[in-house]
Amino acid sequence: MLGFFNTWLVLAEAIVRRRDFIALLGGAAAIRPLGAHPERPPERILYFTYSAGYRHDVIPLSKVILTRLGSNSGVFEVTATEDTSEFSTENLERYAAVMFYTTGELPMSDAQKRALLNFVRSGRGFLGVHSATDTFYTWPDYLDLVGGYFNGHPWHQSVKIEVVDPGDPLVAFLGNSLQVEDEIYQISDFDYRGSRVLLRLDPSSVDLGKTGVHQRFYGWPLTWTRYYGEGRVFYSALGHEPSVWQDDRYQRILTNAILWSTRRSP
């Protein structure tokens, strides 16, 4: 009888210990930080580099650098393509943002164009670099998306670039200005009211009397953000020269822009 009683005590103690352990687990769950969630998978970025006009020699390098930036970030991954069939409603659902380094009138069908606009309008991201504004001059909706058109590049030199808002998280690390050597775009048809300019050319650093300079006042914008529906749009006119793509500052701007456009910060 005593042996039975001892066995019962051992079992009872085991049950109590198990209950205490479960309670401890419950307590740990209760104090989990608010908003904690399993690690999110990387955001997928579709990098589209079709050239219907001039093709930039730097495009292969840009693919390598963007792919590496994504891998290093752990937050996004880049798929590069020149295949317009990627622009179907179903396929775009796989991506968080689309980035253009393009020229000319791209061979996209009306359905593909609608799919792109609806994709961004629904809350996804769109990013354009350099000649993305030298694209789709005959499609007015594209101008509404990107915010301006390329209007010549009279300067190919080292210039001073002003940081319009040094407090903006996308460019705060740059300070008040930076010096860059690149092909410098002029922008026409710029939607100044609907855009937030981040970087602008300091006109005192160039010859405004040079042939091809247009004295339209758009504030010499070079990099900006805007919204299209619920979607976030980023554009930078920089990115012609390999040295720009290899510049840590430019890489950080693009990384920040991708994070912003996909709502992963900054």
Label every PLM stretch briefly.
Residues 47, 54-135:
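Helical hinge/lid and interdomain linker segments adjacent to catalytic or ligand-binding clefts
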Residues 20-37:
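N-terminal export signals
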Residues 39-42, 49, 57-60, 64-73, ...:
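Extracellular ligand-binding/catalytic regions of CAZymes and related secreted enzymes
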Residues 1-16, 28-29:
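N-terminal secretory signal peptides
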Residues 106-176:
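A glycine-rich, often tryptophan-bearing local segment used as a flexible ligand/cofactor-contacting loop or short
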Residues 148, 153-229:
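Catalytic beta-strand/loop cores that center a nucleophilic Ser/Cys/Thr
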